Amino acid sequence: MARAQVLLMAAALVLMLTAAPRAAVALNCGQVDSKMKPCLTYVQGGPGPSGECCNGVRDLHNQAQSSGDRQTVCNCLKGIARGIHNLNLNNAASIPSKCNVNVPYTISPDIDCSRIY
């Protein structure tokens, strides 16, 4: 379960990293976890991401306005992914495209969050 959440968080982080900087919004891991929970079934090999999952990914993408927010989301996703058993990396990486969110990064548990701006 934790891995799925990490993958979902990674997807959200990638989405946030691609967002243009705007007014600062202090994001935390609790918020990231909450937005990504609906994606857990999918990252554990279940059927395609739900509408609720995609809404969470879009919300995170829109809320991650600053580099700091995007890096926070990235680190939160990595932490969550470490705890998910039966994590399907392909499903996790496909979330942005399946949710119609353009992310120019590959979602992975070993992404270097410090390189996200």
Curated annotation (Swiss-Prot):
Q: Which domain of life is it from?
A: Eukaryota
- Single GO molecular-function term? lipid binding
Q: Give the species.
A: Hordeum vulgare
- Gene, per the UniProt record: LTP1
Give tissue specificity per the record.
Answer: Aleurone layer of developing and germinating seeds.
**Pfam families in alphabetical order:** Tryp_alpha_amyl
SUPFAM superfamilies in the record: Bifunctional inhibitor/lipid-transfer protein/seed storage 2S albumin
Disulfide pairs here are 29-76, 39-53, 54-99, 74-113
- What residue stretch is flagged as signal peptide? 1-26
Q: Where is the lipid attached (Cis-14-hydroxy-10,13-dioxo-7-heptadecenoic acid aspartate ester)?
A: 33
Listed name of the protein: Non-specific lipid-transfer protein 1
Biotechnological relevance: how is it used? During brewing process, structural and chemical modifications of the protein occur. Both unfolding of the structure and glycation should increased the amphiphilicity of the protein, leading to foam-promoting forms that concentrate in beer foams.
What keywords is this UniProt entry annotated with? Disulfide bond, Lipid-binding, Lipoprotein, Signal, Transport
The family this protein is said to belong to: Belongs to the plant LTP family.
Q: Which GO terms describe its biological process?
A: lipid transport
Job description of the protein: Plant non-specific lipid-transfer proteins transfer phospholipids as well as galactolipids across membranes. May play a role in wax or cutin deposition in the cell walls of expanding epidermal cells and certain secretory tissues.
